[in-house]
């Protein structure tokens, strides 16, 4: 029988079969292949879900989409975070903590590479500085992104609009700690009981409150929301430079005048002339990413830097290779 993987914990899988949860383990014949939240699996054995019972996962169905990352930008080994997602909700606070635009760009690259629809979810609008919201929306306007803006307290009207966007979809929440992901999940799934964190007054960063990836069913008309641990980094070392450029959809078409095999990092690159000034920050972000996956930084020699995405060694590591 088919079931949906809603959680993974030390070799045990919480699967949803109809209206019941069934704990399962992976059959030996599946080998070392990993099972992640969002996977559709086939179960055999005791699938009653009764306490103390354990079913077996004997097959993992082909994945429609795969959201992945690497440990850092110099590590080519990919880690699968979630399977079969339809949407990626990029949750970003407009203040407390300050928005990290280059982290948003990394999430966007991962979404486009996985063929997952990205959605900007901008929180704490009540704390936003003047023009803070408008500047972010203007930067990403060329991408035609869907977006939702949330203040505190959360508006019922905005939540209703977000519920319509999530209905019938498998949606993943990503963002750094402290941006309001857990608050949002608790509002959308009343019995979720996700722990709400705070922002450290010393570092200005959020404290981790969710330690694992978990899928939660949305109330009717249904759908799934997948919460992930707060991320301070998001490695893209498994991606080629060509694919990263292609994921910057607002800039990719402007590379037509670049010379063959252009790295987009040197003086011969045509992007310096074709990219409008309004997109200068996006071009800077692209080039920082390209330098990072090469192990270099603007103005440095190869190997002279730690990858930007590995800036926090204590970062939680959702997903598996």
Language model region names:
Residues 33-54, 59-81, 85-87, 110, ...:
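Helix-rich effector regions associated with P-loop NTPase G domains
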Residues 80-84, 91-145:
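Phosphate-binding glycine-rich loops and their immediate beta-loop-alpha structural context
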Residues 16-18, 219:
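Short strand-coil-strand connectors
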Residues 181-194:
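A conserved segment at the C-terminal end of the G1
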Residues 127-179:
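Canonical P-loop GTPase G-domain recognition
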Residues 11-15:
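Short aromatic-glycine-enriched beta-strand elements
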Residues 21-35:
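Beta-strand/loop nucleic-acid-binding surfaces
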Residues 1-9:
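Structural detector for short beta-strands of small beta-barrel domains
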């Amino acid at each position: 029988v088919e079931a949906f993987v809603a959680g993974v914990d030390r070799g045990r899988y919480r699967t949803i079969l109809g209206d019941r949860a069934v704990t399962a383990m992976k059959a030996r014949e599946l080998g070392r292949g990993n099972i992640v939240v969002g996977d559709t699996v086939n179960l055999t054995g005791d699938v009653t879900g009764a306490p103390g019972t354990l079913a077996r996962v004997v097959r993992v169905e082909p994945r429609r989409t795969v959201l992945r990352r690497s440990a850092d930008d110099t590590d080519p080994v990919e880690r699968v975070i979630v399977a079969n997602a339809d949407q990626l909700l990029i949750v970003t606070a407009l203040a407390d903590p300050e928005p990290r635009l280059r982290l948003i760009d990394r999430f966007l690259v991962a979404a486009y590479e996985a063929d997952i629809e990205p959605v900007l979810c901008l929180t704490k609008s009540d704390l936003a500085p003047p023009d803070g919201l408008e500047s972010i929306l203007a930067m990403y306007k060329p991408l035609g992104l869907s977006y939702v803006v949330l203040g505190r307290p959360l508006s019922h009207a905005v939540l209703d609009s977000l519920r319509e966007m999530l209905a019938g979809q498998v949606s993943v929440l990503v963002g750094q700690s402290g941006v309001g992901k857990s608050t949002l999940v608790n509002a959308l799934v009343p019995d979720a009981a996700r722990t709400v964190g705070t922002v450290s007054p010393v570092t200005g960063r959020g404290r981790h409150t969710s330690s694992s990836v978990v899928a939660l069913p949305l109330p009717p008309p249904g759908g799934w929301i997948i919460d992930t641990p707060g991320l301070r980094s998001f490695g893209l070392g498994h991606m080629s430079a060509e694919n990263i450029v292609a994921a910057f959809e607002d800039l990719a078409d402007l590379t037509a005048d670049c010379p063959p095999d252009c790295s987009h990092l040197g003086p011969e690159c045509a992007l310096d002339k074709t990219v409008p000034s309004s997109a200068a920050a996006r071009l800077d972000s692209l080039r920082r990413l390209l330098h990072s996956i090469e192990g270099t930084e603007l103005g440095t020699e190869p190997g002279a830097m730690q990858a930007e995405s590995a800036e926090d060694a204590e970062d939680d590591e959702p997903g598996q290779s």
